[in-house]
Amino acid sequence: AMTRNEVVVEFTGDDAVAIAAALKAHGADIINVSAGQTTNDAEPAYGRMFQVPFAEQIRLEADVPTIAAGNITSADQINTIIAAGRADLCALARPHLADPHFTLRAAAHYGFTPQVWPNPYLSAKDQAERMAEQGFEYHSVGRPHVAPVASAD
């Protein structure tokens, strides 16, 4: 507990579960789980899918669906998280910034043909499906490589 003008030094998974349970009790259908760097001295552990354990704990202990976020960069990671029951949905930011067609390409790669593509993208849909049939692997990263700009010297 804290009072006005105090800083929370430690916020545990158990605290998050208690808050999620209270939100569920007041009608929340799903909890978006994201741990942010909210203070200058925060030093969170950062790595691949680093916030998924938080979503999983809340999902299991508060018995409420969760949305996982945090350095989830591929369709394979998403499928693993969902199939393992670690979260109910995944939120992506950088992968969609790097590739606005991330979801459409992943659908083609996995052979999910009912995915609706906007009319202007239909030729890309055909190409993506043909490439998937020919065995091309689909990979997406959240931070695409950008070649350095040559010096003007």
Write out the residue ranges for each language-model feature.
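Flavin-dependent oxidoreductase catalytic cores
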Residues: 1-153
